[in-house]
């Protein structure tokens, strides 16, 4: 034969059983974008912004050697940060619905610190949950 049957079988895409449908997964960044845009219009929100937590090494002048490790902010920082019209801090960690309860210990500690200081903090998987956090209902 021209092609090995075992290799041909391995190269074929995996097929689903008839009648099954793959559940769509909405990326967290899309949920963040929707919440961010909607909260920007909320009457109690003075300012809200997305926080980028980045980490990496600075390269030396030769482009190869790493001179030092840099982090843009500390571990556990929330996804959305801002403040209300009356000056209270807003800290919202955005999660996909299926990973709602999967906070890192650092994220949980940050949310707890904001709450202890009198801020509004919580985990949101949609705009309604984020609005409830801002309005103090959660």
Predicted regions and their residues:
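Catalytic phosphate/metal-binding cores of nucleic-acid and nucleotide-processing enzymes, i.e., regions
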Residues: 1-138
């Amino acid at each position: 034969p021209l092609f090995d049957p075992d290799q041909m079988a391995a190269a074929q895409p995996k097929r689903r059983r008839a009648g099954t449908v793959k559940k769509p997964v909405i990326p967290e960044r899309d949920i963040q974008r929707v919440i961010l845009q909607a909260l920007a219009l909320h009457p109690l929100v003075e300012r809200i912004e997305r926080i980028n937590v980045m980490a990496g090494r600075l390269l030396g002048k030769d482009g190869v050697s790493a001179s030092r490790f840099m982090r843009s902010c500390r571990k556990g920082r929330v996804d959305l940060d801002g403040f209300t019209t009356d000056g209270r801090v807003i800290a919202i960690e955005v999660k996909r619905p299926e990973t709602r309860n999967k906070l890192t210990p650092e994220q949980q500690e940050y949310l707890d610190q904001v709450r202890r200081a009198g801020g509004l903090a919580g985990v949101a998987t949609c705009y309604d949950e984020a609005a409830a956090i801002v309005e103090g209902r959660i």
